[in-house]
Amino acid sequence: MIEEEIEVDVDIKTRADKFHKFIRRSQHVPKATHYIKGCDLLEGEWGKVGSILLWKLVFDGEPRVSKDMIEVIDEEKNVIQLRVLEGPLKKEYKSFLKTMKVMSPKHGGPGSVVKWNMKYERIDQNVDHPNRLLQFFVEVTKEIDQYLLSKD
């Protein structure tokens, strides 16, 4: 199989730096969305490359966990990249990499754009592309945006 990729842009009202900073502090994300029930630090330090996180979430109405390693944090470009190490995704994908980049809007103005990108290699052709997971991240992003706006 070959590595494949899907992505989506989500327009938000929160500034790019503020959104990125909040996501980087993963332990606070469960406060902002009902989809994420917890995030535990298993190894390393919060918000540092090489750290391993255990996400507890609700996906398609079912509780799930995902053990991820932070591979990239770029404060200047507002990028965070996580590699899935363990969890349900590893049963269907040989590799799975999630990248979030927060940018200023293309046409200027307030707010920002969150680009979610997923690179993955399916175990076989019978495994679906992760479109539902991409939509999950759209919903999580919108809820976090609303939470951050309510804190201004």
Swiss-Prot record:
Q: Which Pfam families match?
A: Bet_v_1
Q: Which domain of life is it from?
A: Eukaryota
Cite the SMART domains for this sequence: Bet_v_1
Q: Which residues form the signal peptide?
A: none
InterPro entries according to UniProt: Bet_v_I/MLP (IPR000916), MLP-like_ligand-binding (IPR051761), START-like_dom_sf (IPR023393)
Q: Which GO terms describe its biological process?
A: defense response
Query: Which family, according to UniProt?
Result: Belongs to the MLP family.
This chain belongs to which protein, by name?
Answer: MLP-like protein 165
